[in-house]
Structure formats: C-alpha cells, structure tokens
C-alpha cells in the first residue's frame, strides 16, 4: 500500500470534517477528542494489502462524555453526512470504516469501560490488573489530533507511563508461574504420556507467555497476538537472545523433545534478565528433573510474590479481552445476520 489510511484520515479530518464540525457543532466539538485510535491493524501501523477487505476506509474516531454522546453524538454523526464528498484521495468515504461519514463517535466513559473495564485512568492495583494488556494498546495506540478538554489525553498519558512497578512485578510473577507450571512442566508431562493433543496446547501457550514476558521485562505493552511477533522484533534487549529459540521452537518439523529443550532455554534467558534487572536475587543453577522438568521460573514466581505488598499478592491479572467481548457480543446481537455475514465476507458458494 502506498499511503497509510491514517495519514489520509488525518488530512480528511483537518480539511473536510473539522471545519464542518466547528461551524455546526462548536460546543460539542470543544468537548470531543478526535484521532485514529482503538481497533484495527492500521492503528498499529501494520496495515497492508490484506487489511482493506473489511472495516476499511477513512476513519476518524471520536470520544465525548457519555452524557453528551447520548444527547448529541448520533445527531452529529448523521448531520455531517450530507456534507461529505463521495471520495477523498481515491477512498470511498461512504463505504469507509464508520459506514457513511468517516466519523465514528462514542462515549468516552463507555469506550474505556468496554476496553479496559473502568471508566477512568487506572488509580489502584485492582484497576491496573483488571485491564487486559492487549486492550490497553487500544487506548494508547494511534494518534490524537484534537482534545481541547484533555480528558482522553490524560487517560492516554497515564497508561502510556506504563504499569506502576509493583503491578509490573505482579504480572511478571503470574506469567512466570504459567510459563513454568502450565507450560514447560505441562509439556514434559504430555511428552511422558505421549499426549500430543495436550502437548500442542501447552506448548503454544508457553511460547506466547515467553514472548509476552519479554515485553514486560522491556517495560513495553504487548499487542494482540497477530502483531506480537512484529513488535517483539523491536525489543532492544530480549529479541536477540530469545528469537532464535522461538523461531526454532514454533517450526512444525521441530520434535517435541527439542521443543521442550527450547522452552527450557527460553526460561534461562528470562531468568538471566530477572537477575540482571534486580527483580530476583542470584541463585545456583538448578538441575532439570526427569519427570517434573525444569520449573525454573516458578522459583522467580515465589520470590517476587514474597517481596510484593500483601494487598497485591492475591490479585490475579486479567489477561483475556473480557470487557471488549461483552461489548462485541452486544454489537453482533444487534445486527441482522445478513449484515454480519457481509462483514465476515461470507457469501454463498457456487
């Protein structure tokens, strides 16, 4: 693709949409934040030739206070429609991202709640741990072009500052526990029992957790799975030592015993950085057990927990997109089935 849809959308907003909004809705515009943010590969800067087959086109995302949205949001979105050109820079505006205007407005508090589970910037351990990391990305990504009140800017800035250190450590501990206990240990048991079904599940999850741990050690949010590896390649410290292990491990031709060995070496790399960063203390080299395998990172899990505040130890991070899925289910339930099939590019065969 020769031109990013984000760049085109920014120009469209400045040249076409913003003058209309300032003229017809000056008070509402002053209360609204505009940009491109949220969901979609283009917001991550990862759009390519495949991205344009669904939910594609000029897009301006906007968030305003919920009360204002309920009163004026839908009116604004519909009122700009007659003033929109059919196309802009070769893009069909009326077939774009938001279905006819290029402008997608929602309530700020509702948007936050359906993305990270709270309607404000995180202010407590529970707030931080209740927000799925891959959905924090959908608040901080993209671009914000106008936010005169600074409400959304404030939320973005708090999240862009990354986790408070105790929260980061609690998350690292949780991932160490799962990589080791539900990953490498589980794979060892699956191999011993010749259970390839279970081996496939636990191996895939373990590789995912190892790469996500690399992001935590670098103090960077990981994105959703489709783009995790692309951003993994940008990590300044962990990519170089982990990538050869990950790349060999995920090859289908790599035997199960070798996959387990590679998981164990990933654990060594992560453990090295945990010690180097002062997260855990230096320790002796542990031996691999013939039936339990190499539960190295569960040593780190326990040590980190011991040093955490008591009120944080029992808080479990939310890592699935539970808040967004609740919203998505309501969205899909409100569509005609034919419309949903069209969005999925499902058409009757010949």
Where are these regions (language model features)?
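Conserved nucleotidyltransferase catalytic core and NTase-mimicking acidic/glycine-rich helix/loop elements
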Residues: 137-314, 323-325, 329
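Extended, compositionally biased alpha-helical segments that mediate assembly or anchoring
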Residues: 312-350
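Conserved NTP/Mg2+-binding pocket subregion across the NTase superfamily
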Residues: 70-192, 244
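N-terminal regions immediately upstream of nucleotidyltransferase
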Residues: 1-19
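Glycine- and acidic
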Residues: 1-6, 59, 188, 193-195
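A generic structural motif
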Residues: 64-69, 193-197
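Membrane-interacting alpha-helical segments
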Residues: 15-30, 91, 153-166, 210
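Active-site nucleotide-donor binding segment shared across nucleotidyl transfer reactions
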Residues: 21-61, 65-67
């Amino acid at each position: 693709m020769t031109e990013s849809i984000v760049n085109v959308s920014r120009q469209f907003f400045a040249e076409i949409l913003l003058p209309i909004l300032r003229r017809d809705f000056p008070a509402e515009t002053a209360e609204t934040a505009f940009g491109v943010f949220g969901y979609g590969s283009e917001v991550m800067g990862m759009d390519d030739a495949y991205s344009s087959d669904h939910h594609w086109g000029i897009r301006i995302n906007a968030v305003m206070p919920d009360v204002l949205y309920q009163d004026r949001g839908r009116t604004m979105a519909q009122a700009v429609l007659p003033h929109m050109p059919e196309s802009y820079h070769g893009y069909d505006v009326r077939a774009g991202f938001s279905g006819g205007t290029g402008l997608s407005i929602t309530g700020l508090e509702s948007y936050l709640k359906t993305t990270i589970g709270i309607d404000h910037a995180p202010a407590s351990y529970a707030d931080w741990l209740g927000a799925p990391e891959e959905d924090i990305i959908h608040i901080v990504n993209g671009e914000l072009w106008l936010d005169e009140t600074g409400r959304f800017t404030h939320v973005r800035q708090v999240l862009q500052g990354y986790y408070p250190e105790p929260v980061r450590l609690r998350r690292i501990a949780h991932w160490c526990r799962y990589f080791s206990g539900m990953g490498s240990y589980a794979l060892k048991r699956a191999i011993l029992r010749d259970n390839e079904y279970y081996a496939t599940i636990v191996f895939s999850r373990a590789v995912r957790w190892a790469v996500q741990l690399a992001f935590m050690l670098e103090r960077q949010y990981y994105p959703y799975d489709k783009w995790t590896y692309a951003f993994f390649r940008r990590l300044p410290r962990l990519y170089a030592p982990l990538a050869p292990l990950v790349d060999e491990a995920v090859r289908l031709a790599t035997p199960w015993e070798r996959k387990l060995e590679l998981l164990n070496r990933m654990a060594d790399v992560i453990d090295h950085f945990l010690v180097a960063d002062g997260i855990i203390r230096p320790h002796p080299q542990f031996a691999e057990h013939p039936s339990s395998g190499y539960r190295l990172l569960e040593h780190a899990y326990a040590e980190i927990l011991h040093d955490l505040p008591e009120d944080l130890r029992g808080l479990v991070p939310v890592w699935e997109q539970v808040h967004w899925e609740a919203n998505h289910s309501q969205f899909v339930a409100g569509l005609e089935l034919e419309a949903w099939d069209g969005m999925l590019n499902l058409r009757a065969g010949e």
